[in-house]
């Protein structure tokens, strides 16, 4: 059986916030602030949903993504060091 291809951090993060419906604030490179929940993403864009409306945001326009709540995607440092 072929070994799994490791996911990059960006895909892991976006998949985590999508599955858990974590509310996000996305800042664009031009300073615009968008808020919502990720419903879909690919290599080039993110689909953000808020109040029944969807926005397709191109990743090259994104500066920063800030979750609305603390998230824990990986084991804590002590747990990871022990493995």
Swiss-Prot record:
Residue ranges constituting the Sm domain according to the UniProt record: 11-71
PROSITE patterns given in the database record: SM
Keyword RNA-binding belongs to the record: yes
A Pfam short name: Hfq
InterPro entries (UniProt xref): Hfq, LSM_dom_sf, Sm
PANTHER family according to UniProt: RNA-BINDING PROTEIN HFQ
Task of the protein: RNA chaperone that binds small regulatory RNA (sRNAs) and mRNAs to facilitate mRNA translational regulation in response to envelope stress, environmental stress and changes in metabolite concentrations. Also binds with high specificity to tRNAs.
Subunit structure: Homohexamer.
Protein name: RNA-binding protein Hfq
Provenance organism: Methylocella silvestris (strain DSM 15510 / CIP 108128 / LMG 27833 / NCIMB 13906 / BL2)
